[in-house]
Amino acid sequence: MDLKAQLKAAVEQAAHQMGMPVDAAIQETPANKPGDYGTPAAFQMAKAAGGNPAQIAAQLAQTVVLPAGIRRVEATGPFLNFFLDAGAFVRGVVERPFELPKREGKVVIEHTSVNPNKELHVGHLRNVVLGDSMARILRAAGHTVEVQNYIDDTGRQAAESLFATQHYGRVWDGVQKYDQWLGEGYVQLNADPQKPELESGIMEIMHKLEAGELRPLVEQTVKAQLQTCFRLGARYDLLNWESDVVGSGFLAQAMNILEGSRYTSRPTEGKYAGAFIMDVSEFMPGLEEPNVVLVRSGGTAMYAAKDIGYQFWKFGLFEGMKFKPFMQDPEGNTIWTSAPDGQPDDERRFGHAQEVINVIDSRQDHPQTVVRSALGVAGEQEKEERSIHLSYAFVTLEGQTISGRKGIAVSADDAMDEAQKRALSVLQGINPDLAAREDAAEIARRIGLGAIRFAMLKAEPTRKIDFRWEQALALNGDTAPYVQYAAVRAANILKKAEEAGYATDGTGADWDALPDIDLVLAKQIAKLPEVAAQAARIHSPHVVAQYALDLATSFNAWYNAKTKQGKPATNVLQSEEGLREARLALIVRLRKAFEDTLDLIGIEIPAAM
């Protein structure tokens, strides 16, 4: 239990003794206020039981038993302010490993889900990075996480790319990345003024896709796309194919479940006559038209109905698909796929989630809300609450809108190549010796890919991003290189200490010698579990990215601090014996905090910068 949690428990215990139970909030005190932590608990107690808040605060201050690490408590009006014991607090931070409050249950995260007709472009990377980071955060929180990638193998985009290959007599040379080659045909077809006359040929390909005749070609595209995602650090557990979802009868099973709801009907007159409709007014208030058509009067299912069936399956409301191994990821883990010739999921290995997160762009806000509402219509209120749409806004590149159909895009592979190239150029400009190292390419890879991931994560998902190279790779500002540089700086201090023979594990540390400036840094380190728990709770990795920036800024402020005489205030290796060892142990913990934080968002720390 961290110190804030201990303080909360101590205040609540004291309030209980006073006969005024309270759910105490523990907050950091503002910079211009006394103390390190505070609570307005006396306000709540006075409101519930009557009495003067200031008097209750004074009594509470006398009653509360302070946990180790808290030096004293003061009642300031109706507030309680707690003052930390710097040495005890820092030691507690150093000796306590990063650990999140454990959450149980399985979470299914669907992300990527790019049409299998061309390569990923830079705009797709936001989806991949958001989904992969959420998987990392939720695993750290203790959840079992299953990452799914939905493959629309029967859609028009896949058909157009395959048709273009046939129509233009295009031949793959085996050298160019397959998905990039396939995408060139897609762009060519959509620029062809004769395209309307080619509709019958495109439809013929679509029918073959629906029959599964061209699946090996689509699989080849998917494997090429996955190589792009692997390179960015993303990993997957299961690929679900549209043709298998349709062929497994999910639609019929879902409609059977919804048939029994008082919110569904089959009108016999009016504009919905003969259709199967769902009234979502209780679940989506404010709609002009609360009725959603699931199946048209002619028997054709709307796409929303298919999505509902798929979501019901993810939550384990029914079975149906078969599975088999598809390929291995770079670590040798098996990626599974749905397949007509696979085996039934008798062990309930896939789906059966307690929570489902769909990472899909903001254009799908309304359809995803309909899918969520369908769970409520089916009487599955708990599942409705845990059906999450992680919505995100579009990405532009250097101010330019991306369009894969028109070929106005930079491929994700090219973007990663460019990031590494530019990172190496930055290294050469800063430190030519560093750029000449044998591992310079690996250093540049970590900086470049880190810059891309961070740029896609640092803002709230609903905010638009304009990705700009110069900003993303800057060593100053809200960038991955800024955080990575701070982490490397911490490692360099430890390396010099070890070369000098100084202990870095706390042996010989004089914790009481630590001044408040070290306490400020330790308080920032101690926030990590709370930040990660918040990211898991609100389903957004951006708070972890922002914390990484705060951690780097706090360390840089500590590192560059000066005494009143203008001399370095925190030169670790020149600190007095005892203080030096305490500070080195703190830097070890800081470095681990950088590693843990960046790992949550899939960013690696380079060996040098």
Curated annotation (Swiss-Prot):
InterPro entries: aa-tRNA-synth_I_CS, Arg-tRNA-ligase, Arg-tRNA-synth_N, Arg-tRNA-synth_N_sf, ArgRS_core, DALR_anticod-bd, Rossmann-like_a/b/a_fold, tRNAsynth_Ia_anticodon-bd. Transmembrane segments: none annotated. Keywords: Aminoacyl-tRNA synthetase, ATP-binding, Cytoplasm, Ligase, Nucleotide-binding, Protein biosynthesis. It is an enzyme of class 6 (ligase). It catalyses: tRNA(Arg) + L-arginine + ATP = L-arginyl-tRNA(Arg) + AMP + diphosphate. Its EC number is 6.1.1.19. GO terms for cellular component: cytoplasm. Pfam families: Arg_tRNA_synt_N (PF03485), DALR_1 (PF05746), tRNA-synt_1d (PF00750). NCBIfam families: PRK01611.3-4. Belongs to the class-I aminoacyl-tRNA synthetase family. This is Arginine--tRNA ligase. The gene is argS.
